[in-house]
Amino acid sequence: MYSLPSQAMRPLSLSPCLTRSSYLRFRILSSLSLPPIFHNSQTRLSFSKNYTRPHLFIRNCTSITAKPSSEFNRNRTQDAPDEKLRALRELFSRPGVNIDAYIIPSQDAHQSEFIAECYMRRAYISGFTGSAGTAVVTKDKAALWTDGRYFLQAEKQLSSSWILMRSGNHGVPTTFEWLNDVLAPGGRVGIDPFLFSSDAAEELKEAIAKKNHELVYLYDLNLVDVIWKESRPKPPNKPIRVHALKYAGLDVASKLSSLRSDLVDAGSSAIVISMLDEIAWLLNLRGSDVPHSPVMYAYLIVEMDRAKLFVDDSKVTPDVMDHLKNAGVELRPYNSILSEIKSLAAQGAQLWLDPSSVNAAIMNTYEIAIEKYLTSNNNKKSKTKMHTDTTGQSGGPAGVFRTSPIAFSKAVKNSAELEGMLNSHLRDAAALAQFWVWLEEEIHNGAKLTEVDVADKLLEFRSKQSGFLDTSFDTISGSGANGAIIHYKPEPGKCSVVDSKKLFLLDSGAQYVDGTTDITRTVHFGEPTAREKECFTRVLQGHIALDQAIFPQSTPGFVLDAFARSSLWKIGLDYRHGTGHGVGAALNVHEGPQSISFRYGNMTPLVEGMIVSNEPGYYEDHAFGIRIENLLYVKEVGTPNRFGGVSYLGFEKLTFVPIQTKLVDLSLLSAAEIDWLNNYHSQVWEKVSKSR
């Protein structure tokens, strides 16, 4: 247990609740803990005589869909962006290519959000390093699409050779619409089919066919890799490790047995799994191939009587080999996945393939091979005919094409996973307590700290915690206007000094052996303006509203999104990112299928045991950014009534880090909201002061 100085353990007066006329205050009492004690000055707003005006700490939260992946190192090549485009276009006329346009997405062959540096092709060709975006290059134009989280970043990073397409803005065409507009009818659009999900490739194919364009799969030739040449980073080759059962909660045999029951119910003989976190979760393995995500590059095929892991065997340690052998899992070379798909199809295997995650290369290989099998068996009646199954998703005699059952199972945490998440969050909170006190003292003493200095120091505090492995994404450390860049990543020599006269947004997270954290706080080390306080308070009100939400079972996340935005909406403000994303247990900091977002297409219900972030925000371009983010887990709550006989759900907090009250405009808060803030800080003090 951490040893707290005696003065740190001595509480200030704590009123049972604060009235609207009370002055909310929080005092940092030790470099180890942030006791959330508020002083009730009764009817006056002045400080008591012996009380020093407190500095309060918060951090801000990031968007739900994606935090920045490990950013691409732009110093790896001296090629000018124009030269890269010229070299790429020269390949368009190469024999066997013959295309008019080429699309470069952000993903790797597994549709990962965070990817290894050697697969950051879109970043290499465009110079834009955000985690989400699509580059399209024609013979005379180059355009990049990204969403609202990255508009400002893309403006800074793209050269004049590129057109920035702000996805979602009025009048901005989609990639399909743009291609149909700029290409002459009958054009050929090339893609690497490993980098597109089957669904995405089919959508693209159908859209461009309206102008008689052809989608060309370039299986054996990624054009960006050709021009990247020797400067391209080597593929990762770090060892895999076994994820201990005390953290996993379920052994591999139990997980495989449950999955095979799903195969029987679906009428499938085997399932092909390509999502890296699904493979890691199912096999109780963790890796280090992808920055910030404890996963390894692999494919997995689970049949009724065996399973095959396609992975570079140089990563497999003796412990991992024994672990897999005991679970009945065989090893295969990573690059032999297409050969195995062909072999299974030649035997008439009805494979379960998730079109939203399995890449187009695998899907197309299976469809061609199974068609050949059906033809050779004179089964022409079922050769190409598809049907709709009872879930409303496509399937047929040739295979089962529906969402992977692993995603949902992984999202619903068991008791061991929840315990690990709780414990890791408390250790993380202790590190943040030390960090915030250090930062306050440094700023107070006049230190000139850059945004990178701050991020590095936070990493230093976290790395001292037991079980720490890595950050869970690149720390977003933004002072002033940089805080408005939702996925800002400071760079040495280019970043700003943390300014005590401006808002400072810090969004960070960590990977521990037993859990994954993600927290954002926004703070001010000087005197915030009335505008900053109002915006911050309204973001806080949205955060509180979502935290306190109670809803019937089977409610999808989009239903709750308005809880977090309502206070901002009242004065005509909003934010361009989702409100909440799923979080893995010692896995990816972003995971599905659940989310809390204005995108109402995701009908995944929130279920007891799921973890989501609660991170509303507000951003004024070139001025400041505000986010407040905690992680929550879903649990059943008791209600006096159960309309329709259904259970009702709510949230419990995983994150316990103070929220800076200096930024709160008390006149906007209700008594209930003040109570929430007081109670939360009481919990922070109670839990974190005792944590290890």
Describe the role of every protein-language-model region.
Residues 2-692:
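Active-site neighborhoods and metal-handling regions in enzymes and metal-associated proteins
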